[in-house]
Amino acid sequence: MRSVLYSYILFLSCIIINGRDIAPHAPSNGKCKDNEYRSRNLCCLSCPPGTYASRLCDSKTNTQCTPCGSDTFTSHNNHLQACLSCNGRCDSNQVETRSCNTTHNRICECSPGYYCLLKGASGCRTCISKTKCGIGYGVSGYTSTGDVICSPCGPGTYSHTVSSTDKCEPVVTSNTFNYIDVEINLYPVNDTSCTRTTTTGLSESISTSELTITMNHKDCDPVFRAEYFSVLNNVATSGFFTGENRYQNTSKICTLNFEIKCNNKDSSSKQLTKTKNDTIMPHSETVTLVGDCLSSVDIYILYSNTNTQDYENDTISYHMGNVLDVNSHMPASCDIHKLITNSQNPTHL
């Protein structure tokens, strides 16, 4: 008896699931219920989410519902005659935030670093890489589609990264620098033409037929961008300087090693001693002279924080022989520039 009753209950359950327990009926006050749809002036049961109408109702039999198959879905009460196909797999620049199942479509959203250019009913259809703000610029906001807005860093702020997320940071007001100015004055020098060679991230050099000035730099965050060289009355003034967009990380020591080499057969060398060494910032220097073609050398190295009120500075100097007067010089760039790319330590010039 119990087995017969259990079978009967199971049979009734199947009928209810398939919508066959209630025959279609006429609308009440011209309306059907929320879980019904209207067909030929009859109110028929809708299929629940996750199923579709494998057989529509007629005057005697209600809707027959069948579960959705793999990669298909219905998310609302319906009388669709087939389930909807889920969206395809997410692109490489997207992440799946909801997987496809019988009641929900797959949803893909943009990965970090991307924004949605074209939205769909279920997530984003097209993701585009966000704009990256360059050195000296920071993220100041976002467009209506989610792309980055870049703005120049104002007074008292800086940025030394290329990023789609970093904002301009407040300047550290002491014990660091964002600008390096190197001045090298030499006597006697005759050749007025020069070649500048840059090995990115490693060294700068100015060479003439008489001598070569090489500056090797290590762990320096400000980027050297330009040089100058001029000769007047056998006195040469030359140098290198950086941009102002990048601050020195105080956990590192910016090291500058200079070699001034005469292009003759004399290979003797000597180290110059600092004559001024006002140091509160993270830097270190050496100067080596190779050869005997010069009788006077002046070197001035200025490390500056250009965003402080009076320019906080460290000044380093080296001297040999007479102090040279270069006030009448008109510095100019070298005639030839050569760039050697160092793939292990790339730096934007």
Swiss-Prot record:
InterPro entries: Poxvirus_TNF-rcpt-II_C (IPR010806), Poxvirus_TNF_rcpt-II (IPR011172), TNF_chemokine_rcpt-like (IPR051670), TNFR/NGFR_Cys_rich_reg (IPR001368), TNFRSF_N_viral (IPR034059). Keywords: Disulfide bond, Glycoprotein, Repeat, Secreted, Signal. The keyword Secreted applies. GO terms for biological process: positive regulation of membrane protein ectodomain proteolysis; regulation of T cell proliferation; symbiont-mediated perturbation of host defense response. It holds the Pfam family CrmD_SECRET. SMART domains: TNFR. Inhibits host immune defense by binding to host TNF and various chemokines in the extracellular space. Binds host CC chemokines (beta chemokines) and CXC chemokines (alpha chemokines). This is Soluble TNF receptor II. It comes from Monkeypox virus. Glycans are attached at residues 101, 190, 249, 277, 313. Belongs to the orthopoxvirus OPG002 family. Its main location: secreted. The gene is OPG002. Induction: Expressed in the early phase of the viral replicative cycle. One of its GO terms (cellular component) is extracellular region. It is found in: Secreted. Disulfide bonds join 32-43, 44-57, 47-65, 68-83, 86-100, 90-108. TNFR-Cys repeats lie at residues 31-65, 67-108.
